[in-house]
């Protein structure tokens, strides 16, 4: 058993409101420059829908991910080394700009420089950000079908619907939808790393983050076609591949990713998981695609097991990382409550961004029919009869196996009904918890984690090299930085709110007050927000 650590994320889809704040802040932080106009490390898709790029789940077309060989091994779906060498100068499975969209801007100078009093109203025509030519008609964008806006034209092209042989009503009153935020999966068995001829893609051993070495990248773009989630992009200006970095500079100082920090719905959870690296090939090569979900769960190790802790120490994993893994919300959502599921495990990459499936399509349908959307008996009956949402979610998260999805949704439904009784002042009904194999205390703990968890409960992130202070040499490019002061370090690097209020904060001294409003919870008085009248 070789224990390794992985920074993982879970997103609770019921809490996503589709505001795209995560996409905007991620783009401003990482891809707000020439050559990256079409690149979105984080994007939010409306489901059912074709996604971004269009039809990225159609692996018959793109040939991303792995396939199992007749001998029980794995090979990239797009082919091995010989095929890569034969097509290295022309990759036939590469998405074109039309599969994404041609980024554009407008001729704002024409508006600003238009002479006063001219007979016609000046207009700002769209122009391409790739070659500067005028665009006659804008036909697609990164979020064209948001909120089922393109349902009549694009809904039938959803690869999951086609794969599951499902037909969804296009009338808005009969349709169902939910939002799916996507980032790089930082897989345990990434195809992009194996597809790169230059060896520029690599997975960090200390935290499992998959990155691109910009110095070694030669722009072959095999990683783009190899990634089944299409989360590796090509910068047409630099000629290099780029991808989501999981905001590793922030994680190294104990701060969450930008998308997590700015998420309005507070739907993201970050934490450490341990896994057995020796069993990754075995799990990824599981014969039945519907068994891949359980196979991946089987290689994730219990951080409370003394044998796992002993093996982690032997591998040099710091004690602070072991403590973080034991407090990880990711472990609770995947194992303790059996809620979180991986995205398309059939790609055999063992993704490490998991999702709590949404109950909202079922609740909305039940409520629209005039029934009680909070009654667990009604919801559990609806889950058994409304097969389209259930089978669609199974096509996304469990390779078509509806049992894990139904189990997760049943527990979410039980939580709604159980907590309603408590909030209304009624006696808790233990039968509701027992109907889904849980106790009332477990339901309440699950509710606290999903609904009202505080900042430090959602993000349990150990710092890099926690047992020793950071070397000052590595921080020289940032100027005068004190590596022993984490509050000042974050402030100097511009990497988010400080962890705590500094001494004298809000007491009326000459120094500016610094308050972390991100970690403030309703009902509490943030220290330093208001001056102490008694001290004046």
Language-model regions, residue ranges each:
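Non-ligating segments of multi-cofactor redox enzymes
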Residues: 1-536
């Amino acid at each position: 058993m070789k224990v390794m650590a992985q920074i993982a994320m879970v997103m609770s889809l019921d809490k996503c409101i589709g505001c795209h704040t995560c996409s905007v802040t991620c783009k401003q932080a990482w891809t707000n420059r020439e050559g990256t106009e079409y690149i979105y490390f984080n994007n939010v898709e409306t489901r059912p829908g074709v996604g971004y790029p269009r039809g990225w789940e159609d692996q018959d077309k793109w040939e991303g991910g792995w396939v199992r060989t007749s001998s029980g091994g794995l090979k990239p779906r797009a082919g091995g080394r010989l095929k890569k060498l034969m097509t290295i100068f022309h990759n036939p499975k590469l998405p074109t700009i039309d599969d994404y969209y041609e980024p554009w801007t407008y001729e704002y100078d024409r508006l600003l420089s238009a002479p006063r009093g001219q007979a016609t109203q000046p207009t700002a025509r769209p122009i391409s950000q790739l070659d500067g030519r005028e665009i006659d008609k804008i036909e697609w964008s990164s979020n064209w079908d948001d909120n089922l806006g393109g349902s009549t034209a694009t809904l039938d092209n959803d690869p999951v619907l086609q794969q599951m042989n499902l037909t969804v009503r296009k009338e808005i009153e009969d349709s169902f939808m939910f939002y799916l935020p996507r980032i790089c999966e930082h897989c345990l068995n990434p195809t992009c790393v194996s597809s790169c001829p230059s060896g520029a893609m690599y997975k960090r051993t200390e935290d499992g983050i998959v990155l691109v070495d910009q110095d070694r990248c030669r722009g072959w773009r095999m990683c783009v076609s190899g990634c089944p989630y299409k989360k590796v992009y090509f910068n047409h200006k630099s000629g290099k591949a780029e991808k989501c970095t999981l905001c590793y500079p922030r994680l190294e100082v104990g701060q969450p990713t930008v998308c997590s920090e700015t998420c309005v719905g507070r739907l993201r959870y970050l934490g450490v998981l341990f896994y057995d690296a020796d069993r990754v090939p075995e799990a990824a090569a599981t014969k039945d695609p519907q068994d891949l979900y359980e196979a991946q769960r089987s290689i994730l190790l219990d951080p409370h097991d003394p044998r796992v802790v002993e093996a982690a120490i032997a591998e040099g994993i710091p004690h602070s990382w072991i403590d973080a893994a034991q407090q990880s919300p990711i472990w609770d959502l995947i194992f303790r409550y059996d809620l979180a599921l991986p995205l398309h495990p059939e790609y055999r990459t063992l993704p490490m961004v998991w999702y709590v499936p949404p109950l909202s399509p079922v609740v909305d349908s039940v409520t629209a029919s005039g029934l009680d959307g909070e009654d667990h008996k009604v919801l559990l009956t609806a889950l058994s009869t409304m097969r389209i949402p259930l089978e669609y979610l199974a096509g996304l998260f469990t390779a078509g196996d509806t049992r894990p999805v139904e189990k997760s949704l049943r527990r979410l439904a039980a939580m709604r009904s159980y907590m309603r009784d408590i909030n209304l002042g009624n006696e808790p009904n233990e039968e509701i918890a027992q109907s889904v194999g849980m106790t009332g205390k477990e339901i309440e703990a699950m509710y606290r984690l999903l609904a009202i968890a505080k900042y430090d409960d959602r993000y349990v992130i150990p710092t890099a090299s926690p047992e020793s202070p950071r070397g000052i040499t590595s921080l020289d490019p940032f100027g005068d930085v004190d590596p022993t002061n984490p509050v000042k370090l974050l402030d100097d690097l511009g990497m988010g709110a400080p962890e705590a209020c500094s001494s004298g904060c809000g007491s009326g001294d000459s120094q500016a007050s610094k308050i972390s409003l991100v970690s403030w919870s309703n009902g509490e008085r943030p220290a330093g927000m208001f001056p102490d009248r008694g001290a004046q």
